[in-house]
Amino acid sequence: DREAILTQARAVLGDEVDTLDSADALQHTRAVQLCLLIAGVAWARELQRQGVDPQMVSGLSIGAFPAAVIAGALDFASALRLVALRADLMEQAYPEGYGLTAIMGLTRPWVEALMQGHEVYLANLNAETQFVIAGRDEAMAEVAQLALRAGASKAQRLAVSVPSHCALLDKPAAELAKAFAGASLRRPRCAYLSGSTARVLWDPQRIADDLATTLLLATDKPV
């Protein structure tokens, strides 16, 4: 139940758990990512309590971690530690001046053409004319203005404090991969579907690799 989840989280994170959902805390990606992990596991366990047992799990980006927990591939305590590290590595690499911007109403070739010469990356391919770019604030603002002039219906800076799903996170992803060496992953009880490759993974090492690269790979019409 809810209290059992929070008790398990406090055993790893201490009193931080009680302030994660505050407005101040949610300005930082650590709180956002931990909240998404805890909420994802809590809701899935509630469904299990009601008799809903999954045959397959999947998650987009940070959602892959609660998916792995529910599949039995990764224990909740390890997931908490790894997600906290994931967030810290991202924020330490880019403490300010970087993030994400959504662009709607233009096709992919058009968006990619506007990105040329700017320090930005295509991070999310959500639909045929809906994309998210990652990079420096100034560079994203320039591309956003170009997009609006080119006929985009919307170009909006997202409330995200770090860049995601792009090559800017090569080093944090490598550090996170090293941390997985100390985590014990198991063969999942049900199918684990990679949100990045749309392939079912059963091998614990392949699942670990998939989780480690969730912050790095662009998401293309996420499954």
Which residues does each predicted region cover?
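Alpha/beta catalytic cores of group-transfer enzymes, especially the acyltransferase/condensing modules
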Residues: 3, 10-11, 15, 71-218
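Gly/Ala-rich beta-loop-alpha elbow adjacent to hydrolase catalytic centers
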Residues: 40, 55, 59-63, 67, ...
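Helix-rich "cap/lid" substructures immediately adjacent to catalytic or cofactor-binding pockets
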Residues: 1-58, 133
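Short, glycine/charge-rich beta-strand/loop segments that flank catalytic centers
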Residues: 23-25, 58-62, 87, 98-102
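Conserved functional loop/turn residues at catalytic and ligand-binding sites
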Residues: 51, 61, 184
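A short, well-structured juxtamembrane/interface segment
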Residues: 219-223
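A short, mixed-charge helix-start or loop-turn motif at secondary-structure junctions
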Residues: 25-29, 68, 210
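A short small-residue
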Residues: 19-26, 66, 154-158
